[in-house]
Amino acid sequence: MVAADSVVVIVRLTPRGGRDAIDGVAQLADGRSVLKVRVRAAASEGEANAALMKLIAKTLGVARRDVSLVAGASARLKHLRITGAGATLAATLEKICAMG
């Protein structure tokens, strides 16, 4: 979902994935598209969530404080809100997904 000042992204996170990386886009059974991401961190005490938000911030070139977890703190599917110019962030995400 893209707004003027932010974008919300659904992420399918794989903790202990061997490396920190964005692996592209996947289609869920219900038709939703999700960003596939893996992180080295384990899914304990919020470590994987922190690694996810750090990776997304670094990849998009935004401050870590501009990435927040909106839903899915203990689930594999997570909703992240990234604050900034929504259209610019969406375009950057599309480029990243095309490369993955």
Where are these regions (language model features)?
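The alpha-helix within a helix-turn-helix
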Residues: 57
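Contiguous, often N-terminal, cationic amphipathic patches that form binding interfaces
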Residues: 1-54, 68-74, 79-100
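Short acidic capping loops at alpha-helix termini that bridge into adjacent secondary structure
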Residues: 64-66
